[in-house]
Amino acid sequence: MPKTLTESEVEATFAKLKAADPDRKVDIIQFFGLQLEDVEELPASVIDPFLLILPPLIRSPHSLLLSSVLSSFLPYFLPLIPKHPTTHLRLALLQVLPALLEKLNDAKERIHSAAGNAIVILGELSWEAEPPIPASNLNSSGSLKAGSLSSSTATKSKPHETLPHLWERHLKDVLQGKAWRSKVEGMKVLTKMRSKEGAKMGLKAWLGVLVDLLEDGDGNVRDQARETVVELLSPPSTPPAARSEFKRLLVARNVRKTIADDIITRILSGEGSDRSTPAVMNSELGKEEGASRSGAAAPAHSQADDVDIVYVASPQDLEREFHSMLPFFEGKETEENWAPRERSIVRIRGMMKGQAHVKYQAAFIAGLKGGIVEGMSKTVLSLRTTVAQQSCYLLKELPEGLGAAFDNFVEFLLPILGKMSGFTKKLIADRSQTAVTSIITHTTVHPRIFINHISSGIQEKNVQIRAYSVNHLKTFLIVHASHAKHQIEATPGLSDTLDAAFRKALADVNPGVREVTRQAFWRYHEVWRSKAEVLMNSLDGQARKQLEKANPRTAASPMPSYASSSSTGAPSSANTKPPSKKMDLKAMLAERRRAVKEAGKQAQETNAGSPRVVSNPVFASPGVQHASITGLPRSSSAVGIARHVETSSPSPVRSPTPSSSATRIRPSPSPERIQSPIQTKIEIDSPLRSRYTSLTPDLARSPPKSPSPSLSPSLGLGESPLRQVLTYPAANGRHSVGEGKRAIPELVEVADNGAEHEVDELTLKEGQKTRDDGNTDQELPPTVQEEVDQVEQSQQFESEPRLEHPEPQQGNTFSTSTSGRVPSTPARSIATGTTASLPNSRNGNIKGEKIISSRLNPEAFQTPLNPKTSALRSSSAIRTPAWKDSPRPEAVTPQMMQKLKERRHERSWWVKRQELLEKASPLKPLTPSPSFAILPDIEALELGAPTLKNLQKIALFCSSHPVRPEPTAEQDEEEKRAFEEEKRVWTGLFDRVMNGVVDFLRPDKDKELLEQGLVVLWEIVQHQWPLVDDTQRLCHGLFRLRESSDAVVLESTNALISLLVQISDPMLLLCNLRSSLDRFLTKHPAPPSSSADNSDPMTSALSQLSLSSSKESPEKRTRNSGYLFGLTSIGMCVLRLSAPVIVSEGPKLGQIVMEAINDPSSIIRQAAHSLLLAIQCVTHDSRKTLAFVPAMSQGQKDLAVYYMAQNGVLEQIGLHKKATSEGEKGREGDRDNMTGELAGLMSRGVIRE
């Protein structure tokens, strides 16, 4: 039964309280509070007297009395204040609330925390007594401002001021005051009130105050303001208008960009719903148009992906963004508006990256229609390459993101992009046609638009335009022909236009255009068989024969592959003798192609691996530089760079020259003419050709060591800028700049595309037929040569996709001694095919010829990890690619764990981990428990309050339900079924467990629970690593744990990041670590330097020395611990990357090094130099390494070079250095030693108290 207190009892208590001394008041207050616990109502006449006596008690210097009032009395008395009439509550807000707000600045947590709770109670009562009235009910004078939080804080009409408004006014005064603790606690009160009242409590009036607090002079206030803003604006229920207003205030009040970007990212990043582009490209399109049409596509990946995400808060925010861009696109391009135009284009791409086109599609389309597309039609034609290139990227991404919603713009843009296909600037022409391919692939306009556009392009005189047009014709038929058949047939004249386009293209003077048209024809034949048959019958005999040979459905019977030691160099003869010499040549060529195809299948089964970064060939002379050799694509996924087949655009076609058509590619007898595996058509000579082509054993030998006196100066190691920038990994970490004329690059599969064949399959020029040793290749007899040329021309595209040879520079021939001046790399074959020793004589028989497959494994790319190859690889009979990496481990191996446990830096953690596992072992069931058995434990973990038993059960469940690495396509079905069964156990559980553990691992948790939670995290990484997707969240969690002062926790983070470096994709982990480090340093800014105003340089320098860690403040120790952790982790990742990737990432790494090298802490400066040494271990070029940090002073550079020399990683000086196997092993040793040094340096960040 609820207890009641009479008016006389309360008055008696009040009288005793007024007359008693402070110690006696404590007893009275505590006893009266106990009486009020079961009371539901107090007499109205006694409320006001108690409200009037409370302020002196709250302001009392007697600490026990103050604590009793706040903790034992107010939580029970304030809810009993009647809500109606509101005079009692108004008196409480006017008398008690100011006193409570004063106590928010009390240093004792129990005081300011209890005061905050009482303020929240008063706020809840105020909102219940007078719910807010919408702003629309106010008159023009604003006097009836009932509950609207957007009202002015300086309300003159006090009688009309509502209770919520009065409560807000007092709290705002505190937030705008000077006491930092009051501000921090006031923001906590605001957060609690918003969580309790929800939408009833508006946000707009608080945003200005909170934005000002983001730039407060006290770090604690800034940190709490960040967290408060994120907590108020991040829930999905937050109105978009509030976010838009917040973004506007950030700009208007000039908040620092680092703070603003971090907050906007945290508020908006979790809202985007991923939307995949329509998968309309079938397997045929993916197979035939998968590769980049020329080397020019290589730099586009790094530039196209290097766009910062722009988050949009609301449709109104998006409308303002577009409106601010429109003035830049008015009129012609000038020196003043071209840069804003480019920034606007990049910003729109950033919006798409932030999913603005998905969340606010209607507003996005309206913005495009409002003038943005018209502006892009100007920028895409800009003479400035960067502006035009960014516009092409945007025009490619818009159809991919918008799909059918982009249809309204297609008819306007196609003519503009069509004109660009004839541009002489190859880079822009290729980018523009990539955009056309994207439009054709992802939009759903009427086929009339595409067919008319393609038909007009085929009628052009420019061969480049015709080449692009026939490739677009092929793409259109693959994507749209089947489902658009009825529309095409129902539109008058459209099918005739399509038929005429085919007739024109099949009779084109350029063979490349004809070949691509033949491939497109058979897709046309599948849909309109009768018309295609009529068209084919109208061709002459030779044209029809070539068309039939291009039929992909024509399959030849497989032939046996070559033997490894007893091969004759030619396939076995047919059972029946060919009737004529011409048929004999045809059969011979067909058998050669079958042999190549069969060897490629063996290579696919033998050398299947994970994707790898590929590169284009580097030519010796700077004069021969293609658009493709401008940079290295940056990896953006755990398996390296995957080229999207649906976005690649075909290259234009060049007409063959007499010199290129009159000569044939033959096996080169000298090392400098070894054909590069990339883009090279590998031929296996027939007996007929072998009679006129001599081989030399020099092909299998290393080039001479002495340099050639006739070597051109432009080929020196130090002279060619291209050689200094682009190098390629050799056997075990060294980087070769080439053998002879060019470096042997990595392998890349080239699609079987006729246009590309015409561009890239260029034969050797006549000036290159003469060898430097004086020997000349003998030509075939004219009659035989003519027959071979005719037959091969008709069958050259029948086989599988081939490797092709880039166009060499005419007239540049070099002797075999050319490569003696640079480190040489053994020739690399595509597959581990069967080989035979070469003949010792120049005219030896063809049995010694080495058979190389040209069929590539589509998955034979690998990430740019450092190679681990044998030092004797160059002398091996079967050679492997120089950039051959081990596949990325998909699971933690026992060897990895054992190696980590043997490190002395983390012994305390391993001992504690074993101890905790032994404690949990009694809970382990005899058989693996079902998934529903740990559902209560997972729910407790998600709530943030798990018990020790909950965590132990989750850890045991993880260890008893491991998930093996995802099987590859070559593995048997049993392995795949086992993987799916193991994965099914975790369906719906893994993300909950992983996210719950990472969120739970915070430094302020109980030590025992925190250590057990770390055990759970370790079990997940060790046993369920194939299921882990969000490594970014994991990195953020590890950096958060660096705020702990517990040595075991810090050792655990050290060991875990060392393991992640081994099992994660290093490029992806490097990006995540950079992001987490930036976030950590933003949360823990550097303390203001006391020597900033010191004019004495010696005193300033000495003040930066950290002589004793005991003198450091806790905040500084925490910052240094996380900073050191991040620098050393990044260094470990760097050691697992290759030189081209380091060159690409060098400026960003250099910025990290430069900031750390200027840090006042000596341990951070030491870590910065260690990171620089790690970069040097990979590049082996101190000039290149120091170029990444151009802001270093000369003294700092000298010190860095001194450290390189002392650690043995400074490169040797001179052009005649010898690349021995011992040197290769030594460089691998340098990496291992540096990894150990970084691990040791990381351990110094463990705070031991």
Curated annotation (Swiss-Prot):
Keywords associated with the record: Cell cycle, Cell division, Cytoplasm, Cytoskeleton, Microtubule, Mitosis, Nucleus
Gene Ontology molecular-function annotations: microtubule binding
Biased composition (Basic and acidic residues): 581-600, 755-774
Source domain of life: Eukaryota
Polar residues bias (residue ranges): 809-822, 831-844, 863-878
InterPro entries: ARM-like, ARM-type_fold, CLASP_N_dom
Transmembrane domains' residue ranges: none
Biased composition range(s): Low complexity: 138-156, 555-574, 647-667, 708-718, 1089-1111
BP GO terms, sorted: cell division; mitotic spindle assembly
Major localization class: cytoplasm
GO cellular component terms attached to this protein's record: cytoplasmic microtubule; microtubule organizing center; mitotic spindle; mitotic spindle midzone; nucleus; spindle microtubule
Compartments where found: Cytoplasm, Cytoskeleton; Nucleus; Cytoplasm, Cytoskeleton, Spindle
Location of the region described as Disordered in the Swiss-Prot/TrEMBL record: 138-161, 545-619, 644-718, 755-846, 860-891, 1084-1118
Family classification: Belongs to the CLASP family.
Task performed by this protein: Microtubule binding protein that promotes the stabilization of dynamic microtubules. Required for mitotic spindle formation.
Subunit structure as annotated in this protein's UniProt entry: Interacts with microtubules.
Name of the protein in its database record: Protein STU1
Encoding gene, per UniProt annotation: STU1
